[in-house]
């Protein structure tokens, strides 16, 4: 579960970093910078927790990252306005919420640690906040 959460937050951070060059509005750029910082802080805590358990934190494989980059390039090819970029960020946050809820539901009645479940709940709240912020720029 923790490995999946780590991959999800790293993918969120990486995706927004790739969009930053296209953002024109300073308020939107500041909001995205704050979001990246939040992702990276959660990822670092997850990485440390995984290492303390003897696991290595791994990001998505290169093919998943490549397809994500291609998809993002296609989405912004004809429309790279801040409003459209905010829509993409909102869609990404919605996916993050859905993925984290699914992980939470799959593991909440198992022997997985309460700390792992707490990470999932934290990410859901973080992504819900990110979604609301993104909607304000659409």
Where are these regions (language model features)?
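Conserved alpha-helical segments that form or flank metal/cofactor-binding pockets of metalloenzymes
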Residues: 30-63, 134-138
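Alpha-helical bundle segments that constitute or directly flank the non-heme di-iron/ferroxidase center
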Residues: 1-23, 84-111, 126
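A structural signal for well-ordered alpha-helices, especially hydrophobic packing surfaces
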Residues: 13, 43, 47-50, 74, ...
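Generic detector of short, locally flexible boundary/turn motifs and exposed helical patches
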Residues: 12, 23-25, 51-52, 59, ...
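N-terminal alpha-helical segment
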Residues: 12-13, 66, 70, 100, ...
């Amino acid at each position: 579960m923790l490995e999946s959460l780590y991959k999800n937050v790293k993918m969120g951070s990486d995706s927004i970093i790739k969009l930053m060059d296209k953002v024109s509005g300073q308020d939107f750029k500041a909001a995205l910078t704050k979001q990246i910082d939040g992702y990276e802080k959660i990822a670092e805590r997850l990485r440390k927790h995984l290492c303390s358990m003897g696991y290595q934190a791994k990001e998505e494989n290169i093919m998943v990252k490549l397809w994500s980059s291609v998809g993002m390039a296609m989405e912004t090819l004809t429309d790279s306005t801040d409003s459209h970029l905010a829509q993409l960020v909102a869609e990404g946050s919605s996916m993050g919420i859905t993925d984290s809820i699914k992980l939470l539901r799959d593991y909440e009645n198992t022997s997985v640690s309460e700390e792992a479940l707490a990470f999932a709940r934290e990410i859901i709240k973080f992504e819900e906040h990110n979604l609301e912020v993104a909607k304000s720029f659409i």
